[in-house]
Structures are given as C-alpha cells and as structure tokens.
Design a protein with these regions (language model features):
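Pre-recognition alpha-helix immediately N-terminal to the DNA-recognition helix
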Residues: 6, 13, 33-37, 97, ...
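N-terminal leader segment of winged-helix/HTH proteins
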Residues: 1-25
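Mid-protein regulatory/catalytic core that forms ligand/cofactor-binding pockets
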Residues: 132-215
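Terminal interaction helix/tail motif
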Residues: 101-144, 148-150
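N-terminal helix-turn-helix DNA-binding core of bacterial DNA-binding proteins
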Residues: 19-58
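Canonical helix-turn-helix DNA-binding module
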Residues: 43-87
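Charged, amphipathic alpha-helical coiled-coil/dimerization segments
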Residues: 70-120
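Short polar/acidic secondary-structure junctions
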Residues: 40, 80-81, 154, 179
C-alpha cells in the first residue's frame, strides 16, 4: 500500500502540468485540454457534446471554450459529412503551432520520451490497466485509441487495394457508426470507445495495413 500511495502521489504531481490556476500563453487549463483533445480526436468525437464529456464540463461551458479557441483562430467549425445537422470542430494550422510550441504538457511528453521505447510502453500499459480498473469500478468509459476498440473491423478487401496515386491502401470500418476508417484514423482518440478483447488480432491486421500503406 505505501508503494501504491507513492505512485499515486507522483501521478498527482505530474498532473499539475495540465491543471493550473490562471492561464499559460493565453489559455486556461480546460482550454488547453480542449485544444489538445480536438487535435487528437477522430471525426466522430470532434463535436461540442463529445468535447463536453471529455473535459467534464457542461455543454454551455464547452461551447464557451470553443468560442474562445475560435476567437484565437485555433479552431474552425465545419458541417459533418455524416450528419449535416451537426458540426465538426477542426484545429487550424495556427492551433497546431500553438500546441507544438506552448502546450504545458510538452515537457512531460519530453520526459516520458526520454525513458526510451520499452519503458514508455510499460508505463502506457500500466496506466491503461489502472484506467480499466477505474472504468469498471465506476461503470464509465474513457476516450481511447481507435485501434484498441471493439467496434473497429477490417473492411472488405481493404488490405492491398491500390489508391489513385498508385499506393496501397488499408481500410477499416467502425461498426458503431457504420463508417469507413482510414489507417491514420486508427491512431486517434474516440469518445465512443469500448476496449476489445481481441487486441492481438486487431494489431496483426494493423501491422499488415501499415506495411501495405507504405507500399
């Protein structure tokens, strides 16, 4: 128990990088969290309601955050291709530049990167297990990476198709939204995520897809 408590205390200290008073580089912590999430989220999750759920805010608060980010030219709204009544939030090039240069968690990312690949993988997997226990205990679901989701499936002949530019493509399908998912999108966050119990099989498909996409 003392070891577990020490580990939790260290996590709390690390969290200070993204929870803070006032603002940093013109944005408050929740505004940074929103910009960061929208930059990493897939097209199904870049909506005002999904954003509100992710940052733990009301829709009214999330709407105000979106307006703030829009006023700084960090976000733009575009009609959804899946549902014309909805909008999708897109991070602009200026928003990406702000994240790359000023995101308060960048120094945490650099510190984790410095651990090396093996240590980084162990840390990620340990944190994932902790979140799994928390999700089960509180009957909740957190946003996570598309590639680990039970709704991701290989789409038709997908692997090995040839695109217009002559490169091989890899296609997947989201069974929840009944929509195609590109290989690049499988690395993005989704708020409708449910973890798969068949991850090795999915990883095998994705490894083949990456090889195909590289020609």
């Amino acid at each position: 128990m003392p070891l577990a408590r020490e580990a939790v205390e260290l996590l709390v200290q690390a969290a200070r990088a993204w929870y803070f008073e006032g603002n940093q580089h013109g944005l408050r912590d929740r505004e940074w969290m929103a910009l960061r999430f929208l930059h990493r989220a897939n097209r199904f999750s870049r909506t005002p309601s999904a954003l509100a759920g992710f940052i733990g805010a009301t829709r009214a608060t999330a709407s105000q955050i979106v307006k703030t980010l829009e006023s700084k030219s960090f976000l733009v709204r575009k009609p959804s291709h899946e549902d014309k009544r909805s909008v999708v939030l897109h991070v602009t090039a200026q928003g990406e530049k702000c994240l790359n240069q000023h995101d308060p968690i960048n120094h945490v990312l650099n510190a984790v990167t410095a651990l090396g690949t093996d240590e980084c993988l162990r840390l990620r997997d340990s944190l994932r297990e902790i979140l799994n226990h928390l999700d089960a205990a509180h009957q909740r679901l957190d946003a996570s990476i598309c590639r680990d989701c039970m709704f991701l499936a290989e789409r038709g002949p997908g692997i090995g198709q040839v695109a217009a530019k002559g490169r091989a493509t890899a296609e997947f399908m989201c069974r929840l939204y009944r929509a195609p998912v590109s290989l690049e999108e499988t690395e993005l966050l989704c708020t409708s995520f449910e973890r798969t119990r068949d991850r090795p099989k999915i990883e095998e498909h994705l490894d083949r897809a990456r090889v195909a996409s590289q020609g």
